[in-house]
Amino acid sequence: MVQSCSAYGCKNRYDKDRPISFHKFPLKRPLLCKKWEAAVRRADFKPTKYSSICSDHFTADCFKRECNNKLLKDNAVPTVFALAEIKKKMGKAVKKEQLPAELEPVPAVPEVDPAIGLLLPPLYTPSHIAVICDHNYTVEDTVHQRRRIQQLEEQVDKLRKKLKIANQKCRRQERSLEKLEKEVSEYREAKGSGYVIFPGNYYEVLNENEYKELTPEITYKEIIL
């Protein structure tokens, strides 16, 4: 039976022409064997007397020098597995790089008109135009909304000032009305009732027990009872 490495992802097999040695799992030493099992990183793996790990997964200090790196030390544990993982990751990365990537839009470069020697505006593709239009619409909408909000706030401030002035006028008119009503009431109490006021220098006060006939040319202006 040809020996092969039990480590995950390792495809090394025994070859007399290759300087690779294979080492059996230490089944008679359960604690050390558990470390080997954990190192190979294979789910539900149970080593048998035929299971082995190649020398590629051991560091140099794991071997006995006097045996020409063919025998492991008693406490040796395979720890070199990064190489296989790196190769695996590199293979995936290469596959991803081989996939065709989406073409990125090339920025437009201004051209020079040979006839007049002036820079011409860059030519935009439909995708560039769509992006530019969307961006401009968004900016314009935002600016317009801000201006509109500012206008509404100014209108609200003006209306508040007008309302304040109107309330002040109403309060002044109410005070004026109360003052006039008070003056009228006091005037009535002071003068009493039953007199007539005529225009100019003609007037006559009528009491309850007196009455004088007025001439037709004279008319009264106001009567306060």
Curated annotation (Swiss-Prot):
GO molecular-function terms, A-Z: DNA-binding transcription factor activity; RNA polymerase II cis-regulatory region sequence-specific DNA binding; sequence-specific DNA binding; zinc ion binding
Cellular compartment(s): Nucleus, Nucleoplasm
Database matches in SMART domains: DM3 (SM00692), THAP (SM00980)
Zinc fingers classed as THAP-type: ranges: 5-57
The keyword DNA-binding belongs to this UniProt entry's keyword annotation: yes
Function summary: DNA-binding transcription regulator that regulates endothelial cell proliferation and G1/S cell-cycle progression. Specifically binds the 5'-[AT]NTNN[GT]GGCA[AGT]-3' core DNA sequence and acts by modulating expression of pRB-E2F cell-cycle target genes.
Name the record gives this protein: THAP domain-containing protein 1 B
Organism (species): Xenopus laevis (African clawed frog)
